[in-house]
A protein has these predicted regions:
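Ankyrin repeat structural motif
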Residues: 41-49, 74-83, 108-117, 139-147, ...
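Ankyrin repeat A-helix N-terminal signature
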Residues: 35-40, 68-74, 102-108, 133-139, ...
Length: 234
C-alpha cells in the first residue's frame, strides 16, 4: 500500500510537471501570440501552439487570444483556436467580457452564430451579457438571434441595467419594440432607479420615449410616474 501511495505521488508529480511544460510561455511568445491573433497570422499561431503555448493565454492587458481574434475578426485564427480541445470558449478577459460578448457588440452575426450554434458558447453568462452588449449598439439581428437561442431578455447587468435600457440608449426603435414584444419588462429599474423611459429622456431619444410612454399607458392603465431625479447612468 505504501509503495502504491509513493508511486501515485510520483506519477502525479510527473503529470503536473509535464502539464506545466505543455503550457509554459515566455513574454516574447505572448507578444507574438497577441500580434498573430490580431492580424490573423494563422502560421504563427500554429507554431506557438506546437511549441507548447496555451490557447487560453492572456495578453498583457488580460485579454484571451480568442477574444482578440474575435474582436479583430481574424477568421482563420478563430477557426483554429476554437477547434483546439483545450480552448475555453467562454474564457473572459479581466473585465468579464467573453468572446461572444465582443462579437455581439461588434455586430458580427456570423461569428455570433458560429460561437453559439457550433461551439455552444454561453449566452447567459453572469455580469453583462451578450444580449446587453448587442443592444448597446443597436444590433437588431444579433439580438434576435441571441433571444431565439435562449438569451434572457430581462437579465440584469452588475448595475441592474437591462437589454431594453441599452437598446433605448442605442436609439434603435425597432430593437426596442422587438425586446418589448419578447417579454422585456418596461417597469424594471437599475440601481439608480431609472427605467427604459428615463434612459430615453437622458440620452435624448424623444421619439422612443414617446412610444414607451404610450405603451406604458396601455399596459398599466396610467401615465408614467416621472422619476424624482435623473442623471447619467453607467
Amino acid at each position: 500500500m505504501k509503495l502504491n501511495i509513493k508511486l501515485s505521488h510520483s506519477l502525479a508529480a510527473c503529470l503536473f510537471g509535464f502539464s506545466s511544460l505543455i503550457y509554459s510561455q515566455s513574454e516574447d511568445q505572448i507578444t507574438n501570440f497577441t500580434k498573430a491573433a490580431k492580424f490573423d497570422d494563422i502560421f504563427e499561431v500554429k507554431s506557438l501552439i506546437k511549441a507548447g503555448v496555451s490557447p487560453n493565454t492572456l495578453d498583457p492587458k488580460g485579454n484571451p487570444m480568442l477574444f482578440l481574434a474575435v474582436k479583430e475578426n481574424s477568421s482563420k485564427v478563430i477557426d483554429y483556436l476554437t477547434n483546439l480541445p483545450s480552448i475555453d470558449i467562454n474564457l473572459p478577459n479581466k473585465s468579464g467580457e467573453t468572446p461572444l460578448m465582443i462579437a455581439s457588440i461588434e455586430g458580427n452575426l456570423p461569428v455570433v452564430k458560429y460561437l453559439v450554434l457550433t461551439k455552444k458558447a454561453d449566452v447567459n453568462n453572469s455580469g453583462w451579457t451578450p444580449l446587453q452588449y448587442a443592444c448597446t449598439r443597436g444590433h437588431l439581428e444579433v439580438a434576435e438571434f441571441l433571444v431565439t437561442n435562449g438569451a434572457k431578455v430581462n437579465a440584469l447587468s452588475p448595475n441592474n441595467s437591462t437589454a431594453l435600457m441599452m437598446s433605448v440608449m442605442s436609439g434603435n426603435e425597432y430593437l426596442v419594440k422587438y425586446l418589448l414584444d419578447n417579454g422585456a419588462d418596461l417597469k424594471m429599474r437599475n440601481q439608480q432607479g431609472l427605467t427604459a423611459i428615463d434612459f430615453a429622456d437622458i440620452y435624448t431619444k424623444p421619439w422612443i420615449g414617446e412610444g414607451l410612454r404610450s405603451r406604458w399607458a396601455k399596459l398599466y392603465k396610467s401615465t408614467y410616474p416621472e422619476a424624482p431625479s435623473r442623471g447619467p447612468t453607467n
